[in-house]
Amino acid sequence: MEVVMPELVPIEIPPNTVMLKGLDWDSNIYFVRSGREALIVDTGTGKRARDYIGLLAGEGYLNGLREVVIFNTHEHFDHIGGNLTFKSLLEGLGIKVSFATHRIVAEIIERGLSGIILDHAYGERFKPHEVHIKLKDGDELKVGKLRLNVIHTPGHTAGSSCLYLDGDTKLMFTGDTVFNRAVGRMNLPTGSLDELRKSLRKLTGFEVDFGLPGHGWIIKDWKGNLKRVMP
């Protein structure tokens, strides 16, 4: 599988995380490996899926991998549109794939609710699919030896969630809840300013070395950034 995007460069975040910076309308994509299993956070629109998977394969990140869990932070098309293409490409490499997300988002994905997914804004039609792991606030997502905490953070959408990886390096995958110096839009279906404020206050209770947002660049001053962007 060849990479056809020379501008796409993997950004390594120690000890075992790779950031693929979203291009065009795609969300950022994150890859976290633990032994023969791995987590992928969000998949973009799908238009560049072959390039993203090709890069991961070409750089050796997929070598010896047996299983991948794809976690969607929320239901917008720029984060879930690549789900089935990622699945097909990974399964073509002999890797088992399952999908995980908050149970509110899972229902939207399984029903293919276009008015909430916003696929029409990209000139596309999302194909509904099964979600294998349906989560709620406080649940633990297990991937290899990794244990990630699910944090329900409504505001951008009702089902938006962050994933927290507590370890020597503490990571928070934020989706579109909070960016570097910005927050996600609240004027889309199921968005809420009041809920977002509550979610941001909730996130201040976590110690985070790197916030890994759905768009833009890494958040290094976690609590300072939350204070700056609080609406």
Language-model features, listed with the residues they occupy:
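Metallo-beta-lactamase
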Residues: 2-8, 12-15, 38, 45-47, 103-154, 158-229, ...
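Conserved beta-strand hairpin/beta-sheet module of binuclear metal-dependent hydrolase folds
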Residues: 6-58, 162-175
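Residues at the C-termini of beta-strands that transition into short coil/loop
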Residues: 21-23, 103, 136, 154, ...
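Active-site HxH/HxHxD metal-binding segment of metal-dependent hydrolases
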Residues: 47-50, 55-140
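Short, hinge-like loop/turn segments at secondary-structure boundaries
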Residues: 115-120, 190, 229-230
